[in-house]
């Protein structure tokens, strides 16, 4: 039985759930200002059915890819923009490819990209004041753009050295027996460890505790941003403590590991600047460049070890997961293709020709691997995990015009969110013949017959890190991904190492019954066009790696004095790359039902107690000021709505509201535990 003093909390929770989950999330977010604008554009995914708007927004969680494809074929190819519904947020206006150049030519004063990213990531709430400062003054991204890209030749040897040690630890070097691995999990560890060799140094990057807590932190921050976006702005400060509690321990461990090293590095750098005779030699890594950039700003706050740690964590958050997913897809696409044998033979021939034996590979040598480059670029085209790209917000108070959409030109008012259908562009038959087929050498021209001794194919298009109007994985234009050159170098290094030292054979049958019935939940919630998505990365619409297992043997000929044994049978199995696994579906259904039941319970109790007369024994009545008690005892008590408002804002309500909102996140914890349980069951 519910206690009397819980009345205000129950009423407050009913309002919170009703407003947040019904009015804000389910209803179409069309302001009065933009209602006429949205009515003048075609919509995708809308059907002639009851509650069409709400059902369309719910449907985008699982069908965003189909909606974008439908809009591309029906409208984009005829130079017409279309509206893509969104759940919990305003809809997207998807521009046709014909407007891409004009779209990218607009100045930042007209189309802002920072506001969109801040809204999607919710840095202020998910990463606190330090994270917000790091996003506002992005020294870490400036360092990557200006110094890491330029100094790649200097760090290439360290990358290869760490990559070799990582493969030894996670894939093994057994030349006799094959080893079973989880491809996605091990690729994430290898990428994280190798990248952090350049980010922060060898000591920290080899700490298993740091790698594990960094993975959990990155995973939880992404999910927290998705959840916080579901709530109205005025409610986000209230729900943030409950959402961020899941990864506070992970953040604390990462800080505990990094802060002493960073503090020591800062002191050594300052002493080196003061004493030219100091024998300490500054390492060549991102941390050192960050410290030097902070010193150039003449701001002592920038040298705070906690802030520098947050910058490194943010750099990991935005780079590691996408790179890990991309290289995992590349391996799966390559070894799972119908022509895998011929592709791998060509890649092995190129690696044998271009890469020396028993030496650390340089950047110049990797730049010659045009087939490796093409194989990864093709995988990123076929298995992209973003349905829409280049998000922008119209910031010009007078709006912007697009002449390329026809006559009359398209006028977009301020506040509208724009994007382009990247996934559909990557699969456009007009740009890529046979676009659904993985062709590892699509971007390479093989030497023609009679052309002489041309043993190395010439690249057909630009390198992996180069963006074009038809290749938007890294974005395009002046705001393209600043770390794409480093990511491309790392992925080429990984794939070349695998091709050089391991053979992969695809098994035709699942490993066991458990593998066929269970699917591994992904290590992060994909962002996207809805509440469970970010910039077009939907929870179920994007290509998903589910069970990717490898069996391998190490080719010891490169490092050991034994004969080469190159047989790494690898099994790559995915029941359905484009559908959610059954465990995740079941957990999501249970979570939605529980939330609906709690909302109905709170609203029902609130309505009942709203009409229940107050009396002197009621705890809520005793909290009423004396001057108001007479009014409540008068004949003809106040209307029910007035009682409702009073009970909502009675004293000491704030902490009770937080307590009741916590119930909702306990349900989310159950949903999250189901995802982890489905992963642990299989492992």
From Swiss-Prot:
Needed cofactors: heme
Protein name: Cytochrome P450 monooxygenase htyF
The encoding gene: htyF
Family, per entry: Belongs to the cytochrome P450 family.
Localisation: Membrane
Role noted for this protein: Cytochrome P450 monooxygenase; part of the gene cluster that mediates the de novo generation of L-homotyrosine from acetyl-CoA and 4-hydroxyphenyl-pyruvate. L-homotyrosine is a building block of echinocandin B, a fungal lipidated cyclic hexapeptide that acts as an antifungal agent. This is followed by isomerization of 2-(4-hydroxy-benzyl)-malate to 3-(4-hydroxybenzyl)-malate by htyD.
Glycosylation-annotated residues: 29, 581
PROSITE patterns: CYTOCHROME_P450
Membrane disposition: Multi-pass membrane protein
Gene Ontology cellular component annotations, sorted alphabetically: membrane
Pathways per UniProt: Antifungal biosynthesis
Keywords per UniProt: Glycoprotein, Heme, Iron, Membrane, Metal-binding, Monooxygenase, Oxidoreductase, Transmembrane, Transmembrane helix
One GO BP annotation of this record: secondary metabolic process
Enzyme class: oxidoreductase
Documented applications: Due to their effectiveness as antifungal agents, echinocandin derivatives can be used for the treatment of human invasive candidiasis.
A Pfam family of this chain: p450
GO MF term list: heme binding; iron ion binding; monooxygenase activity; oxidoreductase activity, acting on paired donors, with incorporation or reduction of molecular oxygen
Residues spanning the membrane: 8-28, 588-608
Residues binding heme: 481
E.C. designation(s): 1.-.-.-
InterPro entries, per database record: Cyt_P450, Cyt_P450_CS, Cyt_P450_E_grp-IV, Cyt_P450_sf
Organism listed in the record: Aspergillus rugulosus (Emericella rugulosa)
